[in-house]
From Swiss-Prot:
GO terms for cellular component: cis-Golgi network membrane; cytoplasm; early endosome membrane; endoplasmic reticulum; endoplasmic reticulum membrane; Golgi apparatus; membrane; mitochondrial inner membrane. The modification Phosphoserine is found at S7. Signal peptide: none annotated. BH4 domain mediates interaction with ITPR1. It holds the Pfam family Bcl-2. Ubiquitinated by AMFR/gp78 E3 ubiquitin ligase complex; mediates degradation by ubiquitin-proteasome pathway in a VCP/p97-dependent manner; prevents from pro-apoptotic activity; promotes degradation of newly synthesized proteins that are not ITPR1 associated. This is Bcl-2-related ovarian killer protein. A motif (BH4) lies at residues 32-44. PANTHER family: BCL-2 RELATED, BCL-2-RELATED OVARIAN KILLER PROTEIN. It comes from Homo sapiens. The lineage of its organism: Eukaryota, Metazoa, Chordata, Craniata, Vertebrata. Residues 15-45 are annotated as: Interactions with ITPR1. InterPro entries: Bcl-2-like_sf, Bcl-2_BH1-3, Bcl-2_fam, Bcl2-like.
Length: 212
């Protein structure tokens, strides 16, 4: 019950930021909440489970809308380049036994993704990469690594994306990337942008990382 109460309070604090200009701290908290939901959805799709106390309370209102859009755009991206987001650890030639190895690899790919600027397409790719790694971790009996990945995602957002997000009014700006004509959500111009971006991301995966 205490975990549920704290989760409800935490969710309320996150949602409060959607009603005004969010601070960097709030943007990071929202990024991590979205990361947990995105990863959880991808794990469920893979027939896997993961325990996260922060998920005890349902994702509220606008945050749920943002998450739904990220997941839908992620679906589109994965259809365009399915091999890029599967078996991520194997593509990066890394072991999942060491947290520094996993987080360093994620940050290396994230750095390449955003080396030429920031777009919503690249943000979706960031979440897809994190989820792909999370699936690998759980499959290899390393569920604790998922928490580390979510924290790492939040730190990357703080250092690299927070200013960009704040200028756009926060995470809800991604809702402009789709035209919602029905519950299925029809993708807008972002999908075309994701298609051209796929080749760049594919190349990023094959950058040699330092040997461990």
């Amino acid at each position: 019950m205490e975990v549920l109460r704290r989760s409800s309070v935490f969710a309320a604090e996150i949602m409060d930021a959607f009603d005004r200009s969010p601070t960097d701290k709030e943007l990071v908290a929202q990024a991590k909440a979205l990361g947990r939901e995105y990863v959880h959805a991808r794990l469920l799709r893979a027939g896997l489970s993961w325990s996260a106390p922060e998920r005890a309370a349902p994702v509220p209102g606008r945050l749920a809308e943002v998450c739904a859009v990220l997941l839908r755009l992620g679906d589109e991206l994965e259809m365009i380049r399915p091999s890029v987001y599967r078996n991520v650890a194997r593509q990066l030639h890394i072991s999942l036994q060491s947290e520094p190895v996993v987080t360093d690899a994620f940050l290396a790919v994230a750095g390449h993704i955003f080396s030429a600027g920031i777009t919503w397409g690249k943000v979706v790719s960031l979440y897809a990469v994190a989820a792909g790694l999370a699936v690998d971790c759980v499959r290899q009996a390393q569920p604790a690594m998922v928490h580390a990945l979510v924290d790492c995602l939040g730190e990357f957002v703080r250092k690299t994306l927070a200013t960009w997000l704040r200028r756009r009014g926060g995470w809800t700006d991604v809702l402009k990337c789709v035209v919602s004509t029905d519950p299925g959500l029809r993708s807008h111009w972002l999908v075309a942008a994701l298609c051209s971006f796929g080749r760049f991301l594919k190349a990023a995966f094959f950058v040699l990382l330092p040997e461990r």
